[in-house]
Amino acid sequence: MVTEEVVLVDDAGRKLGTQAKSTVHTTTTPLHLAFSCYVFNSKDEVLVTERAHHKSTWPGVTTNSCCGHPGPGENLGDAVLRRLSQELGIEAGGVRLLLPDFRYRAVMENGIVENELCPVFGVVYDGPAPKPNPEEVSRADWVPWQQFSRLVAEGGAVSPWCREQMERLHELGESPARWPAGDPDALPIVVRDPQQWQPTLSSE
């Protein structure tokens, strides 16, 4: 069985090493590289998911469409497309960089810590209905973006990273279709080169 590893980074996003994903999330979680993705359709709806109830971090919590970790040496955009396929059965053709410099740290009630440099991407998808993988996602629903935005702004229960991301995304404008692209020069250093984040995989 192949051990899934995450990339450990410093504050600037320089690679420090790797660690098994199964051991990285503790009460002293080191800073590591991750990503978040928001899937939109042409009707300005966003795919909102509920995390599987057996997950070790924030089980059963409502959150954005998809999250994950690129493996050592894996292109960041490819990692986003890989997780969309694995978690939601979505075969997307490309990604759009939205928040290149997003970083967060959050602590669960049991003391387990999330501590990530976590660039945020957007994907437009109008294909077949998503097929959530029950190992990762307990449900997935299309929700009008403005409705979800209001829910979060009014204190609705969502994951801590989703709440912080939504505050930043709200500043980009009312319609996701009109948001400006993020500045790739603000990405963590380890994935700043276009060959390290622009996806090489495509379903198109």
Each model region followed by its residue ranges:
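Acidic, metal-coordinating catalytic segment for phosphate/diphosphate chemistry
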Residues: M1-S42
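Residues that flank catalytic or metal-binding motifs in active/ligand-binding sites
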Residues: E4, L33-F35, C66, L97, ...
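Residues immediately flanking
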Residues: D11, R51, W145
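A short local loop/turn or secondary-structure capping micro-motif enriched for an aromatic residue
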Residues: V24-T27, K55-W58, R139-D141
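A glycine-rich, hydrophobic loop/mini-helix early in the fold
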Residues: A34-H69
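The catalytic Nudix box helix
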Residues: L47-V48, T63-L99, F121
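Nudix hydrolase/Nudix homology domain
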Residues: G60, P72, D101-E204
